[in-house]
């Protein structure tokens, strides 16, 4: 949104749920959630998952972090590329080889990417980001949107009705497709009007 350029700064942090949340990705749960995502983004493409299911998403977090070290724009584009590889192409984002393939396909600087990806620095960084999120800001799930002082922002979402682990129905969606941009604008406006919390010392 160009109207907020230079006024609002958005910083992404990793929060691997398999480490700081409820464990590794659950295939059955995610397959149910795809229907919610399909309703939210009618033009999105989803491919049925194959037997080659990722047992971890840490390589994907690491790869995205490595791309962000090249630039924020490259990082955000590559983060989206990873999501498309998983949801639209059915690729196993838990495999390091797949992440390297995606990096090559995206024409990233492979020397730069591989250095961080292979020396353990990326893993250390994302685990530290997740730890701070949980311990300092009490993050419990994703996505969590917050201001620099820890104030959490929320916008309306559609909640599913779940019975015996199955999604039976979904509430009315507050927005769909590009219509959700307005919700994002509302979040940015709240950020601009927000007065940071003051530290009270006794």
Regions found by a protein language model. Give the residues of each.
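Structural alpha/beta surface segment adjacent to cysteine/selenocysteine redox centers
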Residues: 1-90, 95-96, 167-173
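C-terminal cap of thioredoxin/glutaredoxin-like
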Residues: 1-4, 85-202
């Amino acid at each position: 949104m160009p109207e907020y350029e230079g006024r609002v700064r958005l910083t992404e942090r990793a929060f691997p749920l398999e480490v700081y949340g409820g464990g590794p990705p659950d295939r059955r749960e995610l397959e149910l959630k795809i229907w919610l995502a399909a309703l939210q983004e009618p033009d999105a493409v989803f491919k049925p998952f194959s037997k080659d299911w990722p047992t971890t998403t840490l390589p994907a977090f690491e790869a995205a972090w490595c791309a962000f070290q090249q630039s924020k724009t490259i990082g955000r584009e590559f983060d989206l590329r990873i999501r498309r590889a998983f949801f639209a192409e059915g690729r196993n984002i838990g495999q390091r080889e797949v992440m390297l393939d995606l990096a090559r396909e995206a024409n990233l600087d492979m020397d730069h990417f591989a250095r961080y990806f292979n020396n353990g620095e990326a893993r250390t960084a994302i685990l530290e980001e997740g730890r701070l999120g949980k311990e300092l800001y009490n993050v419990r799930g994703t996505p969590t949107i917050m201001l620099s002082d820890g104030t959490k922002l929320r916008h309306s979402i559609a909640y599913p009705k779940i019975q015996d682990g199955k999604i039976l129905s979904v509430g009315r969606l507050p927005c769909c497709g590009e219509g959700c941009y307005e919700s994002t604008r509302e979040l940015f406006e709240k950020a601009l009007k927000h007065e940071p919390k003051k530290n009270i010392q006794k």
